[in-house]
Amino acid sequence: MNTILTKLKDFVGISEHDDEYETDYEEMEYDRYSKTNSSETLAPEEEEPIRNRRTRESLNLTSDVPMGTTTRNNVIGMPGITNGIAEVVVIEPHSFEEMPQVIQTLRERKSVVLNLNVMDPEEAQRAVDFVAGGTYAIDGHQERIGESIFLFTPSCVKVSTLTGTVHDVPETPKATTRPTMSTPVWGAEASRIAQ
């Protein structure tokens, strides 16, 4: 049981032995400490909390990186949102084995026009059911465009026609406040039961 938790922590990146950078920092701190102790004692105005000093030094260390080199960055972008340009992918599969590629395209927040005219009707029905399930799982939308042609969109796409909106992008729900009651509804009944 302990090994499962350890593996999970390693996978997520919160393991306890993830301090390779910490040892380097401690060595730098030790070297600087030995240099400052060998010189004369610091004046009271030069003393500052260690936390502020470490913050300032870490900022200085990152600013010393030469241009053209990349630093390690923990920010991961949303797939498919590189330029802010929406993309529609037209896929004309020949077999059901190509359907996971359609789901992956939807997960990358790209709309898919699926033309199933080439496929066998039974296999095409199976493919539509599969992609519709994947679309539902990512809160997307599906629309039949024509005979054996379907549009699948992720949740961030608004689908509309000349006559009106077919599917609108859901807005984030606002917190609703409930009116508070001064006396509980069950108060009278509870007192009757208690007697």
Swiss-Prot record:
Residues 32-54 are annotated as: Disordered. Its main location: cytoplasm. This is Cell division protein SepF. Cell division protein that is part of the divisome complex and is recruited early to the Z-ring. Probably stimulates Z-ring formation, perhaps through the cross-linking of FtsZ protofilaments. Its function overlaps with FtsA. The gene is sepF. Pfam families: SepF. It comes from Gloeothece citriformis (strain PCC 7424) (Cyanothece sp. (strain PCC 7424)). The keyword Lipoprotein does not apply. It is found in: Cytoplasm. Belongs to the SepF family. GO terms for cellular component: cytoplasm.
